[in-house]
C-alpha cells in the first residue's frame, strides 16, 4: 500500500499511532477532537450506513509530530471492480485545519485518490463537538454513494478521451498555475505520464494523466490534500481537449 504523506515531515502511521499522540488541553472555548476517535467513529458509522459495501483498507498519515492527520477508509462493492468508495478525513491539534470529511474513490491498483464535491467541515470545536461531528459524519456518508457513482462515471468518460503529450503538458501548466500541482510535483507528473508505474495507465487518455497527477498529490501536505484533489477533478472533468 502506498503512503499518503511523503512530503517533508509527513509519515505513514497506524491507528494505534494515532491513539498515542497526546491531545492538546481543552479550554473554555475549544475542545479537541482525537485523531483516533475520529478515525474509529467514522469507520463505525460508515460501516453501518454503507449497506452492500465491504471495508477494503485504511491509510493514515501524520505530520508536524502528530499535530496534523489525514486518513482514508476505502470500501468495495459491485459498482466498480477497479475503484472503491473512499472517505477521506483530516484533523489537527494545532488549529491549522478544522475537522474535514470528503467523499471520493480510490483506484485499487495504485491507491490513487479521487475526490469530488465539497469538503464537509466542522468549523467550531465547542463543548458539543461530538454531537456536531456525528451529525456531520452521518450527513456526509448519506451523500457518499451518489458521489462515488459520479466519480466512477467520470473515470469512464476520461478513459475515452485521448490526450497527446502537448495537451498533457498544457494541462500540467494549467494545474501549476492554479496551485493544484506544486513545482516539486511537476517532475513526478511528467514521469508518471511519460513512463507510468502501472500498466493500467499506459493508454494516452485523460484518465492516465489524472492518475499521473494523483500520484504526485500523494506528497501534498495534510491541510491541502482534499482541496487539491477536488480542484484536479473539477478542472479535468470539464475539459474537452
Predicted regions and their residues:
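Short acidic loop-to-beta-strand element that houses the catalytic metal-binding Asp/Glu
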Residues: 67-74, 86
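Charge-dense, intrinsically disordered terminal/linker segments
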Residues: 28, 43, 74-80
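Intrinsically disordered, low-complexity regions enriched in serine/threonine
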Residues: 1-3, 10, 57-61, 76-241
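N-terminal low-complexity, intrinsically disordered segments
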Residues: 1-67
Amino acid at each position: 500500500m502506498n503512503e499518503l504523506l511523503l512530503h517533508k515531515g509527513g509519515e505513514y502511521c497506524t491507528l494505534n499511532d494515532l491513539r498515542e499522540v497526546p491531545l492538546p488541553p481543552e479550554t473554555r472555548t475549544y475542545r479537541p477532537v482525537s485523531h483516533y476517535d475520529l478515525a474509529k467513529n467514522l469507520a463505525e458509522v460508515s460501516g453501518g450506513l454503507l449497506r452492500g459495501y465491504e471495508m477494503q483498507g485504511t491509510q493514515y498519515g501524520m505530520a508536524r509530530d502528530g499535530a496534523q492527520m489525514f486518513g482514508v477508509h476505502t470500501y468495495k462493492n459491485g459498482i466498480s471492480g477497479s475503484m472503491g468508495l473512499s472517505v477521506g478525513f483530516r484533523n489537527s491539534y494545532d488549529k491549522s485545519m478544522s475537522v474535514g470529511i470528503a467523499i471520493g474513490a480510490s483506484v485499487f491498483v495504485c491507491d490513487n485518490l479521487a475526490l469530488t464535491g465539497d469538503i464537509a467541515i466542522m468549523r467550531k470545536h465547542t463543548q458539543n463537538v461530538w454531537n456536531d461531528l456525528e451529525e456531520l459524519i452521518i450527513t456526509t456518508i448519506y451523500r457518499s454513494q451518489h458521489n462515488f457513482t459520479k466519480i466512477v462515471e467520470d473515470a469512464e468518460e476520461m478513459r475515452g478521451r485521448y490526450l497527446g503529450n502537448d495537451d498533457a503538458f498544457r494541462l500540467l501548466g494549467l494545474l501549476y498555475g492554479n496551485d493544484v500541482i506544486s513545482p516539486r510535483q511537476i517532475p513526478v507528473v511528467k514521469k508518471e505520464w511519460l513512463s507510468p508505474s502501472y500498466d493500467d495507465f499506459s493508454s494516452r487518455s485523460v484518465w492516465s494523466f489524472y492518475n499521473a497527477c494523483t500520484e504526485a498529490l500523494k506528497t501534498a501536505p495534510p491541510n491541502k490534500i482534499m482541496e487539491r484533489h477536488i480542484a484536479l477533478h473539477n478542472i479535468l472533468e470539464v475539459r474537452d481537449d
